[in-house]
Amino acid sequence: MVDGGGYDENLLLLDGVPVFHPGHLSSLLPVFNGDAVKNMVFHKGFFPTPLEGRISSVTEVNLKEGNKKEHVRTLTLDMPAASVMLEGPIIKNKLSYMVGARRSWLDFFDSLLSEENRLNHSTYDYNAKLSYNFSPVTTLNFLTYGARDDYHLPLQENGENVSVLPEFGISLE
């Protein structure tokens, strides 16, 4: 959030598509795999005309097109999550794919904590992009992404658990 603005005053675009809930863990982690990001542009204050409509900020995130020459696999392990990304050609120099998935592993450490200090939280997300090059200047892209946060909250009265499973996602076909 920028300048104290809420989600309705800050816009996040993923390849030109608005993302309405852009983060996990109260927006500490973005809902897209960092290995899949080609570039990101942040606008604060004055925005280009096509991006008007928000008063605090606009962030444009563009995903990579898959590698058009060879198949590539990437595995990333860091503190909050593990991710994998696959990319490569379907038709060399014409049609490529990029698929990335990520899962937090904070919940795996719960068994090390006492019952009252457990996090009881996990996140998942995926990004995929299919790109077809008609010419050097014309490309058709199909994009999908999805994200999920699982919260398991213990109720103190009877020891039961309540699960809150918000789901966010956009599909373009």
Where are these regions (language model features)?
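Transmembrane beta-strands of outer-membrane beta-barrel proteins
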Residues: F42, E60, T74-D78, M98-R102, ...
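Extracytoplasmic beta-strand/coil segments of soluble accessory domains associated
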Residues: M1-H21, K38
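Hydrophobic, lipid-facing positions within transmembrane beta-strands of outer-membrane proteins
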Residues: I55-S57, H71-R73, P80-V84, Y124-A128, ...
